Amino acid sequence: IMSEEQITPNNGSYSADSIQVLEGLEAVRKRPAMYIGDISVKGLHHLVYEIVDNSIDEALAGYCDHIEVTINEDNSITVQDNGRGIPVDYHEKEKKSALEVAMTVLHAGGKFDKGSYKVSGGLHGVGMSCVNALSTHMTTQVFRDGKIYQQEYEIGKPLYSVKEVGVSDITGTRQQFWPDDTIFTETVYDYKILASRLRELAYLNAGLRISLTDRRVVNEEDGSFKSEVFYSEEGLREFVRFIESSREHLINDVIYLNSEKQGIPIEIAIMYNTGFSENVHSYVNNINTIEGGTHLAGFRRALTRTLKKYAEDSKMLEKVKVEISGDDFREGLTAVISVKVAEPQFEGQTKTKLGNNEVMGAVDQAVGEVLAYYLEEHPKEAKTIVDKVILAATARHAARKAREMVQRKSPMSGGGLPGKLADCSDKDPSKCELFLVEGDSAGGTAKQGRNRMFQAILPLRGKILNVEKAMYHKALESDEIRNIYTALGVTIGTEDDSKEANIEKLRYHKIIIMTDADVDGSHIDTLIMTFFFRYMPQIIQNGYLYIATPPLYLCKKGKVEEYCWTDAQRQKFIDTYGGGLENAVHTQRYKGLGEMNAQQLWETTMDPDNRMLKQVNIDNAAEADYIFSMLMGEDVGPRREFIEENATYANIDT
């Protein structure tokens, strides 16, 4: 079911007058993290998204349908689109070409002038000038009015005025930039990270073709470069099917709406599966609003109201003995919500929560209309959904006891901490660390080796429950999972959602998974990460979850001892101290944490000055949702396919 409205090209003119100027560029180089998030992998890739966002603005306005992104041999990036081309005419106020203004002045651009773009993507709207400021070199070519115009820059400063360099029968913009290695700690682009975001953008913008080419990787057979094309004719409908592809569907239909209410374009796709979790991915102007906001609230309100009214009118709830709550309508629900807002207000800890109040009513109205129509037209599917809601309510009723067990042991009630927890003496969460350690024996060593001031230890017995396959109340009945909630000081239930984790009284801002460096250890890591992703995603979003990396080897030659985390480090030790002869060096392979004594464990894995921690991040929540359900869910087929495809990369420990 769907209701559709077409995008019509916006009639606003896009010329020098549309480019507005707000402030200078030096600030970007002084505090880059303020503008692009950080100066490592995330920020490096964010540069590409800023340029791509400009091309997508052209697509949203109806003028561009193809964007090409290329990672060049030297790790520079080229982005080309077939939009109208950035204006090059004279900018009255700034007394220079509009292109130069857009490239060299922060907060200059068509997105600040409502006439040229009704809505525009890009989180900060700092756009091209910000990328320019953070690049050692940048070249911009504009194809417009039958001509090619060009300007080059170094660290944001033009090398010459905009000049005409040729004729052209196409329109569009081509940008190439070289990220500045004096600012970025990482300057090598990761194909997978870019592919993941570009795939997401293709789903969010139906009919837009986005290609990604990696000129660093050549196919030996035909000499071509590694490349992919992302294109989705059906947009969100395909997106929600992609996320759901490894789950069992409750109904085969995608409930779809594409309409405009109160001047806000709204597109939503909904599917139901037989699972127990709610997975709603929401976007504003193509930005993933991880913390939700008014669009999500409007969606939930309409879903609950419409389904409840239909069930009551159809007399389906007459024999139900338990009370039905809003959460019950969302169990097994997967949805993607995409709204376009002219002036979005972002709130929350990571500035990814939509605050515009007018959006709530608009989404509520749109969803209410389309869902009511769908339920009336599809009574069989409607009954299946309502039956699932009743099942969820009954299970939730059974889960109340389990939830109360978690709640009752809240840290505020005093003496409610799990007996196995060896707590630290400092009470400032920002300084405290909790190690989740596999097994009692390793837990004992960790307790002896830690710094008691700020490091706490919680030993976990065996493998924790795979929450991907378990009903909600079963997960909460598991002792190990209850102990994690209690030790962390996390309770269940917030104002918005009775199932959501409440981390206001979180006791540690570093939660470190510490397991053996073998296959079993990796499996336990994955089970714990699955738990946090599904039950406490805020922990990952805030950057609180880490994985410890114990060394694989201890190499000795005479009096020289060195811990090695990789085979390459071990080989280097052999080359340096053993003349390249493996037999000349004594190597101890650590299979488990228990093989180290307390002092060794502290030196290698727990001491903040020497250890290596991997921070767990989610670059793309929708893709992570798909991967967790595929790797950890009930359906074996997609998992086997994934393993066969990736077997060459697998590190199999025998």
Label each PLM-derived region with a short phrase:
Residues 394-413, 428-433, 444, 448-450, ...:
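C-terminal interaction appendages of subunits in large macromolecular complexes
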Residues 2-18, 25, 47-49, 57-59, ...:
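GHKL-family ATPase ATP-binding module
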Residues 92, 347-360, 563-569, 573-574:
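Helical (often loop-to-helix) elements that flank the catalytic cores of nucleotide-handling enzymes
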Residues 85-90:
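A short glycine-centered beta->alpha linker in the GHKL/HATPase_c
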Residues 30-49:
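Conserved short strand/loop->alpha-helix "switch" segment adjacent to the catalytic nucleotide/phosphoryl-transfer site
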Residues 91-92, 99:
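Short adenine-binding "F-helix/F-box" segment of the Bergerat
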